[in-house]
């Protein structure tokens, strides 16, 4: 999903709404777990936040159920399908629910200062037909991680262009490094590695008006370069990219077997725990630094089924207070989704480990999550993109098939 940040905050009452009234209301929130152990579960974060909120709002109770990322989207779908939608869900995708008319607009809930504080590209990514339904909750970006010890042994410096990346990978291979560049195009998260490379090649999944451009000339050139200049030359390791999952690539990096790879903030802790000394630089582009980094966001959304718009809005204004946004971001190594918290983090020495990722956020491009077709397109990419760099694969054909399916999915979604 993302390693993304949640802005949990606390604060203000919806402008002009006043108190929540005399009758008790219970809000039900289903949330994803960002912790990597029971001790670090997001449940503890929410429990503490809710305790503070309820102490200030005697007429409102908030019940939070936290599920793993493996289960949370399915759990919410089951609740909605059964006619028992939660008041709030903090999950990975909102567009289908928005298109079905099940969600409140953000402007129906949030105070103007809170709504204006979201980073603009995240707020825009929360829109369906130019109306915001998805409220950004957590964000992350990707940078190029490299193993400092392996680079020193090979006598190389971090790459800034594709040619330099290839030369570095060749030098690492000559030193016996198992994965000079790890290229995880396996089914777990191939859509992320793919998007980072498409951006570094100067294009992406869609154009500026949201039309899929998966088989554009630039994208075909990008995958042709990956196939011919990295994979075919044995610079991506012993596992075929289409069989290599992101989690396995991260583990190999933490075990000192990878020279360089794209990574998000959670890799820092994983590598540090194994004693790997690493550096981080922006993703190289074809002839210089990539024009944009890949960003990922997770979303908060509010269902209309039970009403409670006033209470939901009041709670969300509290959730997105700067102190709460920062607390959540720091706890889980994610990036703030608000300008105020981002500015604070950018100036805070304690957050220096996240500055490389934060620097990428202002120009980051996100998945086209506002398109209801994206879930099907993403699944198709996960399943098939690895074929584009396989020995018998042809990038033109593979990207063309994915584009045709994406166009069809987009057409059915809009009918």
Task: Place the predicted regions along the sequence by residue.
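Glycine-centered hinge/linker elements that transmit conformational signals in sensory
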Residues: 169, 175, 211-240
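A structural signal for short loop-to-beta-strand junctions that line the ligand-binding cleft
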Residues: 87, 114-150, 179-180, 290-291, ...
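Short, solvent-exposed loop/beta-turn-alpha elements that line the ligand-binding surface or hinge
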Residues: 40, 107-118, 180-188, 202-222, ...
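C-terminal capping/gating helix-and-loop segments adjacent to ligand/active sites or protein-protein/ligand interfaces
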Residues: 355-406
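Extracytoplasmic/periplasmic substrate-binding proteins
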Residues: 54, 224-311
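Hinge/lid segment of periplasmic solute-binding proteins
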Residues: 92-141, 193-195, 349
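Extracytoplasmic "Venus flytrap"/periplasmic binding protein-like
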Residues: 52, 56-118, 154-160, 250-252, ...
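Conserved N-terminal structural module of periplasmic/extracytoplasmic solute-binding proteins
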Residues: 1-95, 287, 311, 327, ...
């Amino acid at each position: 999903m993302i390693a993304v940040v949640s802005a949990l905050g606390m604060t203000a009452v919806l402008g002009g709404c006043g108190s929540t009234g005399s009758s008790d209301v219970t809000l039900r929130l289903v949330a994803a777990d960002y912790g990597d152990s029971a001790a670090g579960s997001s449940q503890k974060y929410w429990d503490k936040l809710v305790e503070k909120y309820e102490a200030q709002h005697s007429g409102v109770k908030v019940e939070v159920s936290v599920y793993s990322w493996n289960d949370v989207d399915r759990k919410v779908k089951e609740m909605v399908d059964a006619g028992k939608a939660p008041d709030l869900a903090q999950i990975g995708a909102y567009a289908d629910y928005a298109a079905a008319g099940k969600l409140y607009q953000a402007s129906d809930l949030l105070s103007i200062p809170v709504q204006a504080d979201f980073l603009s590209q995240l707020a825009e990514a929360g829109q369906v037909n130019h109306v915001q339904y998805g409220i950004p909750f957590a964000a992350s970006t990707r940078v190029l991680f490299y193993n400092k010890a392996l680079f020193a042994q090979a006598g190389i410096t971090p790459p800034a262009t594709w040619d330099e990346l290839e030369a570095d990978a060749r030098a690492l291979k000559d030193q016996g490094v198992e994965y000079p560049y790890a290229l995880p195009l396996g089914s777990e998260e191939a859509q992320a590695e793919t998007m980072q490379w498409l951006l570094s090649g100067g294009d992406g999944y869609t154009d500026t008006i949201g039309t899929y451009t998966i088989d554009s000339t630039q994208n075909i050139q990008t995958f042709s370069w990956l196939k011919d200049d990295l994979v075919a030359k044995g610079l991506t390791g012993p596992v075929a990219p289409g069989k290599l999952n992101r989690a396995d690539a991260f583990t190999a990096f933490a075990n000192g077997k990878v020279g360089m790879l794209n990574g998000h903030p959670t890799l820092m802790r994983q590598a540090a725990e194994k004693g790997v000394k690493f550096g981080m630089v922006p993703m190289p582009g074809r002839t210089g630094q990539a024009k944009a980094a890949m960003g990922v966001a997770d979303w908060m959304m509010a269902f209309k089924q039970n009403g409670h718009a006033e209470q939901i809005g009041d709670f969300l204004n509290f959730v997105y207070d700067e102190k709460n946004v920062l607390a959540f971001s720091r706890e889980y190594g994610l990036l703030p989704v608000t300008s105020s918290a981002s500015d604070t983090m950018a100036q805070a020495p304690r957050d220096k480990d996240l500055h490389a990722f934060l620097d990428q956020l202002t120009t980051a491009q996100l998945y086209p999550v506002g398109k209801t077709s994206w879930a099907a397109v993403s699944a198709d990419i996960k399943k098939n993109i690895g074929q584009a760099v396989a020995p018998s694969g042809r990038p033109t054909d593979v990207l063309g098939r994915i584009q045709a399916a994406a166009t069809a999915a987009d057409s059915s979604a809009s009918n």
